Amino acid sequence: MSKQPVSNVRAIQANINIPMGAFRPGAGQPPRKKECTPETEEAVLPTSDEEKKPIPGAKKLPGPAVNLSEIQNIKSELKYVPRAEQ
């Protein structure tokens, strides 16, 4: 019985394509971005009476109050424009 030299080359080559940290929890592909659809504009907006109601236990924060629906409306009007080739 002749003994052949032991080689770890195949084992190393097999593991070459595994990225660092691949076996750590949460190391999968990042979540895909959902495309913005105009259905969000059709959502029921709260009336002014509902917006004025204070939440019990809420603290008054410094700075101006920002209307979230206003920001969402402006954001929905924005459109991605690809850069023109020069």
UniProtKB/Swiss-Prot annotation:
Plays a role in the regulatory network through which muscle cells coordinate their structural and functional states during growth, adaptation, and repair. InterPro entries: Chisel. PANTHER family: SMALL MUSCULAR PROTEIN. The gene is SMPX. Pfam families: Chisel. Residues 20-64 are annotated as: Disordered. Belongs to the SMPX family. High level of expression found in the heart and skeletal muscle, a very low expression in the lung and spleen and no expression found in the liver, kidney, fat and brain. It comes from the Eukaryota. This is Small muscular protein. One of its GO terms (cellular component) is M band.
